[in-house]
Amino acid sequence: MKKILFLSLVLSLIVGCDTPFYFGSKDFQTPFERSEGTKSATYDEVIDFYKRLSSEFSTISLRTVEQTDSGVPLHLVIYSPDAEFNLNKYQEERTIVFINNATYGNDTDGVDATMLLFRNLAQNEIKLSENVIVVAIPVYNIGALQGKNYRKTITNYDLNLDVIKNDTQNALSFAKIFQMVHPDVFIDNYTHYTAADYQYVLTYTTSQTDKLGNYLGTYLREQLLTKVSDSLLKRQEDFQKIADSLLKRQKDLLNGKNEQKIAQKSFKPKRILMNDTITPPFWRIFPEETPHSPAQAIDYATLYDCMGIRINTHVKKPYRQRVEANYEMMKTIVEVADRDYAYIKQLKIKQKESNEAQKNYAFSWAIDSTQCVNLPFYTYEIDTITEVVHLNHQKPLVQEVAFYNRYKPTKSITIPQSYIVPKVFQKVIDRLKANNVQMTMIDKDTLMSVVRYKIESFKTLSSPVEGHYWHYDTHVIADTTRVQLYK
């Protein structure tokens, strides 16, 4: 009987202490957990969960903030260890991690993982100091999540491509929220719908580190991601050691002549671990190519000295594995941000000073082919090749691949004293205001000497995309002239 009690205790510790599936109170089990990792929460279930969490725990706050195209307001959930939710108060003193979920309606992995993260933060299952604040949009594309498997907004826009142009109310609200939160680290949770197949449960994409700057970019590339990767691999190894030990202990116990019947009767777990389908739990992460346009949120973050990380869970993997891996990576990022908070704040100050001292601003980038790293890529051996390549999942394979993810500027401009925006361009002004761009009204009619750009030539697509014709290969000429400006 002692053996049985020991086995049950070890099992409880594994499930309870170091996995997302902590059952401190049945009141705060998520739909994902109640379904044993097969179902995601609906929008109403998500919001109800955070309402109950914020009512029960003083460290959690839930508020409505801005409007969306669906007519339903966005929510913002905040974890603050000392129950202080004035973000302006702590923007200089603590690292702020900002999480966005469900840009597409079928990106539910991050929605469920974030619910687990905030629940475990509230119940002190994640041990942190008071140096980090975690903020999240529970569901960004509300209309799409309510519609299920619908990627665009109710107005038929792709939010992933609307971060700068702000054609949607969602994107305009996101810009305002981002400026209010003023994060140090931004996490964008995605589900990766691709035909690619490999061992990874998730991959990641970051802000373009060269554009981010020498201080923050180097830290993101060489320290933060390295620490996250090392921590995940260590946890993966620890989980497997415990699981192997527990399985051996159970086998030995069940093979005992005198205790076999008692053990079978008294101890019948449905599974050894909630994550036992990952053999071993595969939390090794792999980078993907970095976007170099602020049309996407993680590169938009670079405009404000914020390190962006997009977590891409792989749709071909079991849902439980995806949510758990997503949770583990977010949790690890938060832990690193907590430990490195003072250093991150110092780097952010240095990066701001460096940016303000610049005379030129690069606005076009290309891959630097002279800088390359070789990375191990965990895939599978090819089984058959027809019109579609089939991989044999019983034969894992590790190959070395060349990875190019450093960029060099190809075009830049001399930073002017200011830009002049005519009042007729009110939509432009509204977007600049939403992005907290400093502006001053001209208070009297003025004749001013300015540098003016004229479009000399450009190319464009044959049909509009996302409400606009996308121009490219644009060439301008500059001349100096005197322009009459009106108040």
Where is each model-derived feature located?
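Sec-dependent N-terminal signal peptides
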Residues: 4-13
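Structured catalytic-domain cores with a bias toward divalent-metal coordination
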Residues: 17-487
